[in-house]
Amino acid sequence: MILPSGVSLIDRILNGGLGTGLFTQVYGDAAAGKTTLALQFVVNTKRLDFGTIYVNSESTSPLQRLEQMTGMPFRNLEDRVKIMAPKGFSEQGALIDELELFLRENVKLVIIDTLTRYYRLELEDKKTNYANHRELNRQAGILKGLARDHDLAVVVLNQVRAQLRGNDDFEPVAKNIMDYWSDYTIKLRVAKGTGERIIRRVSPDGEFSDGRLFLMNSGFTSERPDEKE
């Protein structure tokens, strides 16, 4: 099954939309619109009458943004959107272990926003780094298994770090682990224009892999705001 975003450019880059059974990684710098991109799929998945489980490890809740994008209060959405908020890396792992218990028949989308936030905080203690790498790999593997075994689309948002070669580009946190599990990898970055973002499909290779999006209150659009007037 394909879950479209409702934005033609995004769906073309993803070969129609999010594929169920697949693990999609989205990474980008701060304010690039990773959460908005994820919520774009939440909104459209609800329109298709399917459900979403949204695991939020960020310090801010996606509720206000979701209400802004849909123009309706969350109470009108909660029959199709379940938001869960772990308080630490180990709690996140325990929640991912139990996700299968929350998969009702209509759930087709699982979003983790972001998988690596608590992981990065744990890395401050160098004595536990190996265990933290192993735990992140375990969590990603469970999510990939859920996607495959339950025919779900899993979207994992990821933070970034500067590349070691010293240019101004960035790479995803825990790149080797995330590359191993990801079927699709999408990169978002802030461009020069107001609300302008660059989206690129890093993998798999293929035609039509990048484009420009514009961030609006209602979500992403592929048309410049002044072109829509």
Please tell me what each predicted stretch does.
Residues 19-98:
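Conserved P-loop
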Residues 5-18:
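Pre-Walker A adenine-sensing motif
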Residues 146-229:
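Phosphate-binding/switch region of NTP-binding enzymes
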Residues 89, 96-177:
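P-loop NTPase motor core
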Residues 3-7, 35, 89-92, 133-136:
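A conditional alpha-helix N-cap/helix-loop micro-motif detector
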Residues 16-18, 44-48, 73-76, 101-105, ...:
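Conserved catalytic network of the ASCE P-loop NTPase/AAA+ motor domain
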Residues 12, 23-26, 185:
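A positional/architectural concept
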